[in-house]
Regions:
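The conserved SAM/SAH-binding core of class I Rossmann-like methyltransferase domains
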Residues: 6
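Residues at the starts of beta-strands that form the adenosine-phosphate
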Residues: 1-2
Length: 156
């Protein structure tokens, strides 16, 4: 397994990244990704960075994670891709819009895990341990087709 990083200045190395490329290479590397971990700011150049056209380039077993800003992903394109089996799943800590409307199909999409915008936050050590324990427990439950802890029933 190798890790490909994408950044504005690809000459700057980052720990854990095997191969760094610039944003101009994004379309070329998407087809190789097993996991897309998006941690980008909200700027005009990152708005809907992952859109329907780019989602179509992903492997059908790819997983999309967004822990940056919600508008980096075209929400409707992602919902359509999940519903149509174009990708394996998604983990969203941020959405567009935020909060995600109750009527959004992502809430009932079994291949989508949504967390309440807690990635990257500064917490007490005890709180961080609890967040990690809940998240890991829910990932295990999700992977085994079991009910998730702390799931909120939605009425629309």
């Amino acid at each position: 397994m190798s890790t490909i990083g994408i950044r504005r200045n690809p000459t700057v190395e980052a720990p854990g990244i095997d191969h760094m490329v610039g944003f101009e290479s994004l379309d070329d590397v998407l087809q190789y990704a097993d996991v897309i971990a998006m941690c980008v700011p909200s700027t005009p150049s990152t708005h809907h960075l992952l859109n329907a056209e780019r989602i179509a380039k992903l492997k059908t077993d790819a997983i999309v994670i967004n822990a940056g800003r919600g508008d980096a992903i075209d929400t409707q394109a992602l919902a359509d891709a999940l519903a149509n089996g174009m990708i394996r799943g998604a983990g969203l800590d941020v959405t567009e819009p935020e909060p995600l409307p109750v009527a959004s199909p992502l809430w009932s999409e079994p291949k989508c895990l949504i967390t309440p915008h807690v990635a990257g936050g500064n917490h007490l050590e005890s709180t961080e341990r609890r967040i990690i324990a809940i998240a890991l427990g829910n990932v295990r439950c999700y992977a085994n087709g079991q009910s998730l802890d702390n799931r909120m029933p939605l009425k629309g």
